[in-house]
Regions:
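Small-polar-interrupted transmembrane alpha-helices in polytopic inner-membrane proteins
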Residues: 21-28, 103-125
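A short, surface-exposed beta-strand/turn
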Residues: 262-289
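Internal/C-terminal transmembrane anchor helices
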Residues: 162-185
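Short, non-transmembrane alpha-helical segments in secretory-pathway proteins
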Residues: 184-246
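Interfacial helix-loop-helix junctions of multi-pass membrane proteins
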Residues: 60-77, 117-143
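N-terminal signal-anchor transmembrane alpha helix
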Residues: 13-43
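Extracytosolic (periplasmic/ER-lumenal) interhelical loops and adjacent juxtamembrane/interface segments
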Residues: 37-75
Length: 289
């Protein structure tokens, strides 16, 4: 009985640790599009670290990501849905006794993967390109059902205890490392305002909008997107043509163009696009349309 109680305490601690990690991660993902545009070096650094650290997590394609604050998120809409589902499941587990028992069933957890798989497979094999709404919805559903089932099987209804505080304390070194890394990265990163000034020094005749392109999207994902031809977007087209070792930590693109039309992410009208290395501020490429 004592060993069983110890095992239960360990699982409860793991639950709280995962819950806090997912909460911090999701919070950063949502705020990153705003932070990356900040002139404050620390806030900019936090946003930059979020984009850079997710190169192994996601393809980071802007055309498959949600837009917040005029900027695309560090991970795609499907991944955002998955993590949001995990977060909601953790919250819901505190009230599991009041929720329908069907949510705890193993078959629902298994079936929840089907919509996610169908949505991804039909796109992978080129039948059609799924929408951000379907990506987010299927990710949210699968993330919630699987996580809610796992919590109820291995942990049960969680309770606030000393393990809650212990999990928070374990998280503090991670937050300290994140802050320290953000200060370091932010001190060398070019701000959106700096890039706008650089672009205006070249072209001051047209309104200029500045966007951030995540590292993996710039280096490989955009040019490998088989649905790129379906977009009337000059920026995406330009990125697919750039062959440069720069941009390993992300790229700023200054778009100087008129009215856009058709299906696009950044811009599709006549004008000029200026690509800058986000770390050095070096002008990587310039295209006129």
């Amino acid at each position: 009985l004592k060993r069983k109680m110890q095992s239960s305490h360990v699982l409860e601690f793991i639950f709280y640790l995962c819950f806090f990690l997912v909460s911090v991660y999701l919070f950063l993902i949502i705020l990153s599009p705003l932070l990356i545009q900040s002139d404050n070096r620390i806030l900019l650094g936090i946003g930059a670290v979020s984009y850079i650290s997710n190169v192994l997590m996601c393809h980071q394609l802007p055309e498959r990501s949600l837009e917040l604050f005029g900027q695309y998120m560090p991970i795609c809409s499907r991944d955002v849905g998955l993590f949001a589902g995990v977060f909601v499941a953790c919250i819901a587990s505190f009230a599991s006794d009041k929720l329908p028992k069907v949510l705890k069933s193993s078959w629902l957890a298994i079936l929840s993967v089907v919509p996610l798989g169908v949505d991804g497979v039909v796109q992978l094999f080129g039948f059609w390109e799924s929408t951000n709404a379907s990506r987010f919805a299927t990710g949210l559903f699968a993330g919630f059902c699987i996580s809610y089932y796992a919590v109820n099987v291995f942990v049960g209804p969680p309770r606030l205890s000393k393990r809650t505080l212990t999990a928070l304390l374990v998280l503090l070194p991670f937050l300290a490392i994140l802050l320290g890394t953000s200060v370091y990265v932010g001190s060398g990163y070019r701000t959106k305002s700096e890039i706008l000034s650089k672009a205006k020094a070249i072209n001051n005749d047209t309104d200029i909008k500045v966007f951030y392109i995540a590292p993996r999207a710039f280096s490989s994902s955009i040019r490998n997107d088989e649905y790129l031809r379906d977009y009337n977007d000059t920026v995406l087209s330009d990125v697919s043509r750039i062959r440069s070792s720069s941009g390993a930590y992300g790229v700023w693109v200054a778009v100087a163009s008129g009215d856009s039309n058709g299906r696009y992410i950044f811009a599709s009208g006549n004008g000029s696009n200026y690509f800058y290395d986000a770390m050095s501020g070096e002008l990587i490429a310039e295209f006129k349309h």
